[in-house]
Amino acid sequence: WKTAKYIAKTEQVDLLVVELSALLHDIADSKFHDGDESIGPQKARAFLHTLEIEDNVINHVIRIIENISFKGGKEAQTFQSTELDVVQDADRLDALGAIGIARTFNYGGFKNREIYNPTIPSDLNMTKEEYKKSTAPSINHFYEKLLLLQELMNTATGKAMAAKRHQFMESYLEQFYSEWEGTL
């Protein structure tokens, strides 16, 4: 939410749409609901109706929620808006850098995944369904998603922030492999 507001300062956006989307986009996240992508938008819509938000704002927020996530594969994004660009950049930035690394290993632990297994290569050609069902080690996630995000950023501010976080993750991986091999 804070990152979305920060990026929004440099863009011409409806700040209410940005803030609501940033706050609600992970409500009932599909990865915690057996991949069901309809629960989050339904819950967000129901909540927004309790606030007496205008229908056009609700519809815009829901479209953002439906289109924000990285889903793997080569699926093209069909809905576009500057508000989506801002919130999507903020969401992607959450996956990068120090916090992104912490989240990666936290989720990997939740899913009982290995931290690293050098015999399991990263798969950069997964379909959306394969990505959602992947049980690969957490380190693979860096190559299958995290290190790809910098090139997917939408806004100039998001790109600049992503570059710093991307570099940090590359340094982290270099350190990780040195420690894994016992050379550092």
Question: Which ranges hold each PLM region?
Answer:
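Hydrophobic, well-structured mid-protein blocks that either form specific transmembrane helices
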Residues: 47, 51-87
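Conserved strand-to-helix beginnings and helix N-cap segments that scaffold or border functional pockets
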Residues: 33-37, 98-99
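Residue-level detector of well-ordered alpha-helical segments, enriched
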Residues: 16-19, 57-61, 97, 142
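Divalent metal-dependent phosphate-bond-processing catalytic cores, especially two-metal-ion Mg2+/Mn2+ enzymes
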Residues: 2-11, 24, 73-184
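Short, surface-exposed helix-loop/turn micro-motifs enriched in polar/charged residues
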Residues: 12-19, 36, 53-57, 75-78, ...
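His-Asp-centered metal-binding catalytic motifs of divalent-metal-dependent phosphohydrolases/nucleases
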Residues: 15-33, 40, 61-71
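Amphipathic alpha-helical interaction segments
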Residues: 11, 30-34, 51, 55, ...
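Alpha-helical phosphate/pyrophosphate-handling elements in metalloenzyme active cores
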Residues: 1-18, 30, 39, 43-51
